Curated annotation (Swiss-Prot):
Pfam families: Glyco_hydro_10. It catalyses: Endohydrolysis of (1->4)-beta-D-xylosidic linkages in xylans. This is Endo-1,4-beta-xylanase A. The keyword Signal applies. Induction: By xylan. SMART domains: Glyco_10. Residues 1-24 form the signal peptide. Residues 25-371 form the GH10 domain. The keyword Hydrolase applies. Coiled coil: none annotated. SUPFAM superfamilies: (Trans)glycosidases.
Amino acid sequence: MKLKRIILLLLTVMFSFSYGEVFAKDGSSLKKALKNKFLIGVSVNTHQSSGKDVAAVEIVKKNFNSIVAENCMKSSVIHPKENKYNFAQADEFVSFGESNQMAIIGHCLIWHSQLAPWFCVDKDGNNVSPEVLKKRMKDHITTIVKRYKGRIKGWDVVNEAIEDNGAYRKTKFYEILGEEYIPLAFQYAHEADPDAELYYNDYSMAQPGRREAVVKMVNDLKKRGIRIDAIGMQGHIGMDYPKISEFEKSMLAFAGTGVKIMITELDLTVIPSPNPNVGAEVSASFEYKKEMNPYPDGLPEEVSKAWTERMNDFFRLFLKHHNLITRVTLWGVADQNSWRNDWPMRGRTDYPLLFDRNYQPKPVVGLIIKEAEKTK
């Protein structure tokens, strides 16, 4: 183990001096190296899908063969009022993917967060009836999925429906329809586009309670003949969580249901969490404290090396099980694009992605490419 660490650190130093230049000259890229392993994807924001962030666009085109919409397909954006859809940004996103021959992922159809305020309530703010919510869900899902039928490879149909302990999250959807809202969402999506792949996506999937609940949910869907193609394991990870062994246990457990695995929303935070138990709960918010923002001017060398080793270890795991995984998606192009800078505490400086704030590949990119090239 000690020898492995020494070798990795030596490689990291070497790549930090040479990889950016080599990367530019020899045509190396993540998507080329991973071509026969799995899709390598990235979330894009509207500045990128519109072409305004030119440097980011070049990174995306060179390194990634799949894209997912970071925000523009969430209901609060695409369907802000019951009888009003805003398709402009989503249309632009899909066109960007098509023009660059990418596998396009729709994110997400049913999610309790960033939910259009009208969706589950009447004009007085009271919960609508089960019949009304079913109708609204079907209209929302059918309208969006049919619009992009044949153009989007797959959809995150339901997002983050399970708690760490395995209980169903007490969302408006659950309050009104119970757990039945999940099979209904998958049913409506399949009816709208029978050829589209359908996914369930969630965070903290290494938690045993969530692992067991997701396995049960997927098995129940399959027993009922409801299509589900893959489980998305969000990769919002830290330097000391989750244990790679627990993450691997979940991968194998999910694969045991007969569906494929997707590593989604991958980022590795290097700054401390004000609460280690928030997972990736977007509603979490803490007041800024200077001591919780330890690296505003850059990472110390030892911290950078440790980050490189940890990210490389996860990619080594993904490559080990590339027969089970169909896609690995980063949650952002370069460090300055990451939501981690403002969650769960606004105004911090984090370094969670594969490309730095100057749009340069980090040393780990070279290590991933090397690892992919030697993986059978």
